[in-house]
């Protein structure tokens, strides 16, 4: 119904449904700690108190893991029931102990399991143990359960006060451990378990005011619809306790520790007369999951049925799956029938301590007497008791899913069948069972072999690989478990196929079983490699319970002949033929043709009409079809493949007119996926209860006429009626959705190139059925019709073909099983009216018509699957053609490669020759270069020596010439320099003298102007001070005047006050005068306040006036100072102009000085010429020359010095 069923939780838990003698159902979830921590269940019965049953789950200390469970705090809740309204005096006490370590929601990290004793007192505390306290939850009208926290240990005590004997039943069940915590199994196996269980304690109050507090796990995935506790008068009590456990394999051959035990159930007689082990089941189911793989939900459940036979209204205590879990494993074991007289005709298979090495296995034994079970499921009760032994092995390995049959001596014999397992089998699996009543049997499955740490099993998070035997065998086991005394237990177990998410792997599920030996002989039982969900077929009459199963088992064994065909056309013919056969069977079922010729024909008329015998025939046909498929496609599964099994249970709400009946409908999907070995059991919330009224199908009723009449409760009709109508609407809408979008044959082929298997979704929803049994119609509503199987990684090898064939097989089985998936097997009294049968027949016809349309839809889907298969063949042919082309290209390329190699050899030889020639040439070249270098060096040295000689000679000549000239120039320059220095010093002194005079004049003028400005400033300051003093005096005078006026006014006020006081005294008796006086006083006060304010304002005005005067004076002063500053600026400007003029004059003087220096130079040159002439000239007049030359030399100097003005420094 809900697509998010697999997404709601990732945990595994159990939902327990408990019934008292008044058929008051109660539910609770419990999670199993033994999913990581192995648990051993010990059941104790006393012959004195034969109904006392103790089921103790003890944690197996053999498992070596990093964490263990610490459960020290017990949470006890007693469920007290009043006296039953029947001829039995019953007192029901349900005590549930939940040992809690912490309050955090359902976080349990268990690695090192400890012993959990029967009293649930001691569990060794270890790290990271988190349990949640158990919180009560009440069933609401909207069918939602309020969730509490996860109980870790549940102990149910029920004490019955009966006429025959009293019965005390104590169930101690362990909860699922949390997912997400590593379980370190020996052999490098790490188990990661996550648990997000939200516990649901469902407290329900029956109409007769009996109190039922129920604890359980609510996964928030389903709304359990109208789960009403209906009191009945049949005194049948059913306990359904589901336990998710890792089962322990007890095999001496394999020395792997880390054994996980499902439970040991012992029957113990305290009087010492008889003390035997009724059933001991040690089953190992370890989930191996590759990293990063998502898997659908799974559930682990353990089912115990204990029936007290001496009373005609016996009590059934059944631990049945009643939870929907996403990550876990579904391990269903049933407790043998326990009778009051101490006799238990139990068929408990004992695994021989054999050589098998099964990776994940399951043994399921359902042994029930036929109490009327009230359950809210799709289907009704099943009359016969069932025993289902299922060995679940992992894909990829040839294991031994065993099948159980009946030997000549009445014992059960297990035939070895080959199963697919993921781990290699060291020795061929050999499993044999011998099932006899009241004998100590032990299930010994092989321990876990050494596994990779990489393939860490996610016990709750990954799919479980558990192949189960064919359903033909399960039907025989169903019939064989109950002896002559077992007459009262019916288990409604209808597998509801959920093909929502199925990979293209081997997928198979069980179908309904035939009840007659003749039908079993006609139908070959398939050899199921993937596993099949145990669904007990229509129950036989009680007289045939011990005889019919053996013949059925033999007939089914004879019919199991694998047909080996490998051709594709043969496979398609098989598919079409099987589809036609299924169609004919469904049509016969819809027409209600009886085909059962058993001794119980009187009680099975309606059973035959519902098509229960055809279920077996269809089962046989599907089985043969599956055998043929196995023969056609014998593909070896790889070790990485995984077999995914999903149990889906549906809850259907039944109308109160028919009583609320819950059928147990586990649906098993097995999928072989590569890259991992995964085990998952997904139990879609399965409600098991005892029906308060007569069953819907009278043909399936037992020989008890009283059990139906006692359960008739008209009081509940008014309560459950509207809810039943609502359920009917919901079921109609859901059935339409299932017929349209979620058909069981939607096959999605595997994409082999990507290495991942696409999800093949199969989902089958049974249409709504309305059954009428005497009083009113019975509506069955599928509550959880589908489960999700997540994508598993697969290698693109052979299993893809096999998965496709098995997908067709599962679809074929879904087609066969859908018309009968809603068959209701209940107990009806033999005195049912014929009118009721006719009404039921009409309803069945309408149902079959609706189902015939669904079958046509399935045919269409099958044809589509055939077309898809043909498309796959075309793709394969295309790939083969491409492969041939690639081979051709490979040949051509190989030839080219050979030719290229030859060329390479020739080229390499030529290259070697060339390298040798190059080496010779290089040596010759180096010798020649060396010779040239030597010759060049000799020539260069000779030329260098010559150049040095020439250079040195020339340098000596030039140096001598240069030295002579340099001396001459030095003497001349020295003379000129001395002359210039003397002239410059004279001019400098003159300029400095003139400049100092000018500076002194400027200083004098500045001082005079500054003194004048200071004088004027002082005069202004004095005048301002005088004005200020005058104004202060005037203001003081005004202040004095105001003060005098104020004093006068105060005196007047005082006199007036005195007058008013006198007046008040005179007119004290006049109220108006008093009022006026008060007014005057108030006015005076106001006037005083105003006067004060005015005075303050006057003071402020005075200050403001003073400030104004000061400001005006300051403004005037500021103006004056600004004027003075402007005058000073003007003077500075004048000084600047004068300094500029002086600088220009100085520049002119410098120019004239330069001119004079030039003239001096010229004169000196002339002087030198004259001197030279004197030395070299005429000797006659030597005296004239110096005098004449001295005069011109001096005259220009003197003229220049006197004419040049003095230059003052700037």
From Swiss-Prot:
Q: Specify residue ranges for compositional bias: Basic and acidic residues.
A: 370-379, 446-455
InterPro entries for this protein: MTUS1/CCDC69 (IPR051293)
- Composition-biased stretches (Polar residues): 381-398, 473-482, 585-605, 692-702
Q: Where in the cell is it found?
A: Mitochondrion; Golgi apparatus; Cell membrane; Nucleus
Renumbered residue ranges of the record's region Disordered: 1-21, 370-404, 446-482, 513-545, 585-618, 683-771, 1177-1210
Record PANTHER family: MICROTUBULE-ASSOCIATED TUMOR SUPPRESSOR 1, TOUCAN, ISOFORM A
Name of the protein described by the UniProt record: Microtubule-associated tumor suppressor 1 homolog
Natural source organism: Mus musculus (Mouse)
- Taxonomic lineage of the native organism: Eukaryota, Metazoa, Chordata, Craniata, Vertebrata
Q: Which gene encodes it?
A: Mtus1
């Amino acid at each position: 119904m809900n697509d998010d069923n697999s997404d709601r939780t990732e945990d595994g838990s159990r939902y327990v449904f408990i019934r008292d003698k008044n058929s008051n159902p109660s539910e609770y979830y419990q999670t199993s700690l033994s999913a990581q921590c192995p648990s051993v269940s010990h059941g104790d019965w006393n012959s004195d108190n034969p109904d006392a049953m103790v089921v103790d789950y003890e944690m197996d200390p053999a498992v070596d893991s990093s964490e263990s469970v610490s459960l020290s705090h017990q949470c006890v809740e007693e469920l007290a029931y009043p006296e039953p309204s029947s001829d039995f005096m019953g007192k029901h006490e349900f005590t549930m102990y939940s040992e809690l370590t912490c309050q955090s929601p359902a976080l349990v990290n268990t690695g090192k399991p400890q012993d959990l004793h029967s009293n649930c007192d001691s569990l060794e505390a270890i790290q990271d143990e988190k349990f949640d306290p158990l919180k009560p939850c009440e069933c609401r009208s909207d069918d939602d359960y309020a969730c509490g926290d996860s109980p870790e240990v549940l102990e149910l005590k029920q004490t019955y006060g009966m006429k025959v004997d009293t019965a005390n039943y104590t169930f101690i069940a362990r909860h699922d451990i949390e997912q997400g915590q590593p379980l370190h199994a020996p052999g490098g196996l790490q188990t990661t378990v996550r648990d997000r269980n939200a516990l649901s304690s469902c407290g329900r109050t029956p109409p007769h005011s009996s109190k039922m507090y129920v604890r359980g796990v609510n996964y928030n995935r389903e709304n359990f619809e109208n789960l009403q506790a209906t009191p009945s008068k049949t005194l049948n009590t059913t306990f359904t306790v589901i336990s998710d456990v890792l089962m322990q394999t007890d095999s001496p051959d394999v020395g792997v520790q880390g054994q996980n035990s499902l439970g040991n159930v012992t029957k113990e007689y305290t009087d010492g007369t008889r003390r035997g082990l009724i059933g001991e089941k040690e089953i190992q189911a370890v989930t191996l999951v590759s990293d990063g793989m998502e898997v659908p939900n799974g559930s682990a459940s353990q089912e115990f049925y204990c029936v007290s036979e001496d009373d005609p209204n016996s009590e059934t205590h059944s631990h049945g799956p009643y939870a929907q879990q996403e990550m876990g494993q579904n391990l269903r074991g049933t407790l043998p029938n326990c009778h009051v007289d101490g006799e238990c005709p139990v068929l408990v298979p004992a695994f021989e301590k054999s050589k098998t090495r099964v990776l994940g296995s399951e043994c399921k034994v359902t042994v029930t007497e036929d109490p009327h079970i009230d359950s809210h499921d799709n289907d009704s009760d099943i009359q016969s008791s069932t025993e289902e032994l299922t060995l679940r092995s992992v894909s990829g390995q040839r294991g031994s899913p065993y099948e159980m049959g009946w030997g000549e001596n009445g014992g059960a014999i297990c035939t070895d069948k080959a199963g697919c397992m993921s781990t290699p089998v060291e020795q061929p699996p050999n499993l044999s069972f011998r099932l006899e009543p009241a004998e100590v049997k032990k299930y010994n499955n092989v321990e876990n072999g050494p596994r990779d740490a990489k393939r860490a099993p996610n016990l709750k998070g990954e799919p479980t690989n558990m192949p189960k035997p064919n359903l033909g065998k399960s039907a025989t086991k169903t019939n064989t478990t109950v002896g002559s005394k077992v007459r009262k237990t019916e288990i409604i177990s209808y597998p509801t196929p959920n093909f929502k998410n199925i990979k293209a792997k081997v997928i198979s599920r069980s179908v309904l079983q035939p009840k007659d030996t003749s039908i079993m002989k006609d139908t070959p039982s398939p050899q199921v490699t993937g596993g099949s969900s145990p669904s007990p077929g229509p129950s036989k009459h009680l007289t045939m319970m011990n005889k019919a199963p053996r013949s059925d088992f033999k007939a089914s064994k004879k019919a199991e002949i694998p047909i080996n065909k490998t051709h594709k056309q043969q496979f398609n013919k098989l598919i079409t033929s099987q589809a036609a056969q299924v169609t004919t069977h469904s049509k016969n079922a819809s027409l209600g043709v009886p085909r059962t010729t058993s001794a119980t024909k009187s009680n099975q008329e309606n059973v035959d009409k519902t098509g229960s015998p055809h279920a077996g025939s269809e089962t046989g046909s599907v089985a043969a079809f599956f055998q043929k498929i196995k023969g056609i496609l014998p593909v070896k599964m790889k070790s990485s493949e995984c077999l995914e099994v999903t149990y889906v249970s549906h809850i259907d709400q039944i109308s109160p007119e028919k009583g609320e009946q819950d059928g147990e409908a586990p649906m098993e999907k097995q999928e072989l996926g590569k890259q991992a070995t995964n085990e998952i059991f997904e139990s879609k919330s399965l409600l098991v209860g005892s029906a308060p009224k007569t069953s819907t199908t009278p043909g399936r009723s037992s020989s008890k006429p009283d059990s139906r009449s006692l359960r008739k409760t008209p009081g509940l009709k008014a309560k459950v009626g509207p809810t039943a109508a609502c359920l009917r609407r919901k079921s109609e809408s859901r059935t339409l959705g299932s017929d349209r979008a979620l058909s069981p044959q939607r096959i999605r082929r595997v994409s082999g190139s990507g290495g991942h298997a696409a999800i093949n979704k199969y989902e089958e929803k049974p249409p709504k059925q309305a059954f009428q049994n005497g009083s009113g119609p019975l509506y069955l509503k599928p509550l959880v019709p589908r489960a999700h199987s997540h994508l598993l990684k697969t290698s693109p090898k052979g299993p893809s073909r096999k998965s496709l064939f098995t997908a067709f097989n599962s679809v074929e089985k879904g087609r066969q099983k859908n018309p009968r998936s809603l068959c209701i097997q209940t107990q009806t009294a033999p005195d049912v009216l014929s009118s009721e049968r006719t009404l039921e027949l009409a309803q069945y016809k309408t149902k079959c018509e609706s189902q015939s349309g669904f079958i046509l839809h399935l045919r269409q889907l099958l044809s589509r699957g055939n077309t898809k298969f043909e498309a796959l063949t075309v793709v394969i042919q295309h790939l083969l053609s491409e492969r041939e082309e690639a081979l051709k290209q490979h040949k051509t390329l190989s030839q080219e490669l050979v030719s290229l190699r030859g060329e390479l050899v020739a080229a390499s030889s030529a290259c070697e020759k060339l390298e040798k020639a190059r080496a010779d040439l290089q040596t010759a070249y180096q010798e020649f270069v060396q010779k040239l270098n030597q010759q060049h060096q000799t020539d260069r040295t000779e030329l260098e020596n010559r150049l040095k000689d020439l250079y040195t000679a020339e340098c000596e000549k030039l140096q001598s010439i240069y030295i002579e000239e340099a001396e001459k120039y030095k003497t001349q320059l020295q003379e000129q320099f001395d002359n210039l220095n003397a002239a410059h010093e004279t001019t400098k002194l003159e300029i400095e003298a003139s400049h100092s005079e000018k500076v002194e004049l400027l200083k004098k003028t500045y001082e005079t102007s500054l003194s004048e400005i200071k004088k004027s400033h002082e005069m202004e300051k004095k005048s301002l001070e005088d004005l200020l003093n005058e104004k202060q005096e005037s203001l003081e005078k005004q202040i004095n005047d105001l003060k005098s006026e104020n004093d006068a006014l105060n005196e007047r006020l005082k006199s007036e006050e005195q007058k008013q006081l006198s007046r008040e005294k005179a007119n004290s008796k006049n109220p108006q005068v008093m009022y006026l006086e008060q007014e005057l006083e108030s006015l005076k006060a106001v006037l005083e306040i105003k006067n004060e304010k005015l005075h303050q304002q006057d003071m402020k005005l005075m200050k403001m006036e003073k400030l104004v005067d000061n400001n005006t004076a300051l403004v005037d002063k500021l103006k004056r100072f600004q004027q003075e500053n402007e005058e000073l600026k003007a003077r500075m400007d004048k000084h600047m102009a004068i300094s500029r003029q002086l600088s220009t004059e100085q520049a002119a003087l410098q120019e004239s000085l330069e001119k004079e220096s030039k003239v001096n130079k010229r004169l000196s040159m002339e002087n030198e010429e004259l001197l030279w002439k004197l030395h070299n000239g005429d000797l006659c007049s030597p005296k004239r020359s110096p005098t004449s030359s001295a005069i011109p030399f001096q005259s220009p100097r003197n003229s220049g010095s006197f004419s040049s003005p003095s230059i003052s420094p700037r």
